[in-house]
């Protein structure tokens, strides 16, 4: 059972637990009538305002009219530019405008998600050893604001409303990306590194377009439209996301799109069967994963050719070897949050000289966490993944609520994709990366669904046909 946080009154705690109850058909009808009327999701000024910080995170804080090396854009100021500091303060302030509106609920979620909150706290605690203290503090503030914004979203909107938010945001950014690639190729195509035919759209790089298109695709697939208009938007968005993925030329995204399709198809096939069939589904997915690993070990050249990579994973293995040497120098505390990749300054210069490649990340999210926060940061991330998997499996095996199962399946998909993505890309706890915030959102959602399941055991036996997920 969930426990009451010390800083929240008993009334608030009971009210919060009440919001986790399974919704009845009557509740669903009332919600449908409400959303159809003036109190609907898009009649709220705050919902439209929320799209602004989400768009900022979706674009990684980079103007779509910039088409330079993504790695050097991230570190070009080395943390010294006044405008960079000012923009961080503004985005933190923008996030806090929303957070303050529901500060009690945000505090309650902070108590439930201690690991998520402790990551930026740890970054702040060890900032004295950072290679660039000002960059660490300002970036940490943005990360903290983004996390609190996620808590606000999860306390304010139902699961389907969250999906609708990402549907609208995704439709705007993906359609804009397609238009940029076709009409403004000097901005919409990745002209760096010999990828002139690859689309990047309004995003910072082709891999980022592929990453976000896939995440938006999962939201569109999981969303249940409430009107014919949103039904059309959903179908169009699925098509646009697949087009963006195809023309991003991002090999990792190709592979993960296949993984997601297999995941969604398998769970959809077993959803109407008995609970033990979920266990069978997990076994099938494990067999598929083990088969891929076996091919990678026994026939690596064949697998690499399918992914469009060579035996060094397009130079990634050389980067990882060089990064391991830097980690060995500071394994406990790292080099400071967002303070390792400083271009031709500090320890990152040694790696750039070694691999003869201008870098802004280790091409592996877990290695980047080690570089920045040492062992402590890595432990937090691994525990967060572990708890997310525990919560997901618990809900999938015990819940009989169709709406809850659909929510858990979407959250779990985001967690799985984030895990695999960060094996050869990097965005774990990035301060301005929407994928990072969606991962945090998924972890929060899985925790809330498990608490809901524990708080209302009847949900295990009952199987209501209508449910709304999280409270508005």
Identify the function of each model-found stretch.
Residues 3, 179-185, 265-311, 324-329, ...:
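A membrane-periplasm/extracellular boundary helix in multi-pass inner-membrane enzymes
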Residues 1-125, 157-164, 223-232, 279, ...:
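Transmembrane signal-anchor hairpin modules in multi-pass inner-membrane enzymes, especially those
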Residues 104, 264-266, 373-419, 452-456:
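Hydrophobic transmembrane alpha-helices and their immediate junctions
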Residues 411-472:
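Transmembrane alpha-helices of multi-pass inner-membrane enzymes
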Residues 111-121, 131-155, 165-168:
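Aromatic-anchored transmembrane helix interface
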Residues 242-253, 354-392:
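A conserved mid-to-late transmembrane alpha helix and its immediate loop/hinge
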Residues 91-95, 121-125, 163-194, 203-270, ...:
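Alpha-helical transmembrane segments of multi-pass inner-membrane proteins
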């Amino acid at each position: 059972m969930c426990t009451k946080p010390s800083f929240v009154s008993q009334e608030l705690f009971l009210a919060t637990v009440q919001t986790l109850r399974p919704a009845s058909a009557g509740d669903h009808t009332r919600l449908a009538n409400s959303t159809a009327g003036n109190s609907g999701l898009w009649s709220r000024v705050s919902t439209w305002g929320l799209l602004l910080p989400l768009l900022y995170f979706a674009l990684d804080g980079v103007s779509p009219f910039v088409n330079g090396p993504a790695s050097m854009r991230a570190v070009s100021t080395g943390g010294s530019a006044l405008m960079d500091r000012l923009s961080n303060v503004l985005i933190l302030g923008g996030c806090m405008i929303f957070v303050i509106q529901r500060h009690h609920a945000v505090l309650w979620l902070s108590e439930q998600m201690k690991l998520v909150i402790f990551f930026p706290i740890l970054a702040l605690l060890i900032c004295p050893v950072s290679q660039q203290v000002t960059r660490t503090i300002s970036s940490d503030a943005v990360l903290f604001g983004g996390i609190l914004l996620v808590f606000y979203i999860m306390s304010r909107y139902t699961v389907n409303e969250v999906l609708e938010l990402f549907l609208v945001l995704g439709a705007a950014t993906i359609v804009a990306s397609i238009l940029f690639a076709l009409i403004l190729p000097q901005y919409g195509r990745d002209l760096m590194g010999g990828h002139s035919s690859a689309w990047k759209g309004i995003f910072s790089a082709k891999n980022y377009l592929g990453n976000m298109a896939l995440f938006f695709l999962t939201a569109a697939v999981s969303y249940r439209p409430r009107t014919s208009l949103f039904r059309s938007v959903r179908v169009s968005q699925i098509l646009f996301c697949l087009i963006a993925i195809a023309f991003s030329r991002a090999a990792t995204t190709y592979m993960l799109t296949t993984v997601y399709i297999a995941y969604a198809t398998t769970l959809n096939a077993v959803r109407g069967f008995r609970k033990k069939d979920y266990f069978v589904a997990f076994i099938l997915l494990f067999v598929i994963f083990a088969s891929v690993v076996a091919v990678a070990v026994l026939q690596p050249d064949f697998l690499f050719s399918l992914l469009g990579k060579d035996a060094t994973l397009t130079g990634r293995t050389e980067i990882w070897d060089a990064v391991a040497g830097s980690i060995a120098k500071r394994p406990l505390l790292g080099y400071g949050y967002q303070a390792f990749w400083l271009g031709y300054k500090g320890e990152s210069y040694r790696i750039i000289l070694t691999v003869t490649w201008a870098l802004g990340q280790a091409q592996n999210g877990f290695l980047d966490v080690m570089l920045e926060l040492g062992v402590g940061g890595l432990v937090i991330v691994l525990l967060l993944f572990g708890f997310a998997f525990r919560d997901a499996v618990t809900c999938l095996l015990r819940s009989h609520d169709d709406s809850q199962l659909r929510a858990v399946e979407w959250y779990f998909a985001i967690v799985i994709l984030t895990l695999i993505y960060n094996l050869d890309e990097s965005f774990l706890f990035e301060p301005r990366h929407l994928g990072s915030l969606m991962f945090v959102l998924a972890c929060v959602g899985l925790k809330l669904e498990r608490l809901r399941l524990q708080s209302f055991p009847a949900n295990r036996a009952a199987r209501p046909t209508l449910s709304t997920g999280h409270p508005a």
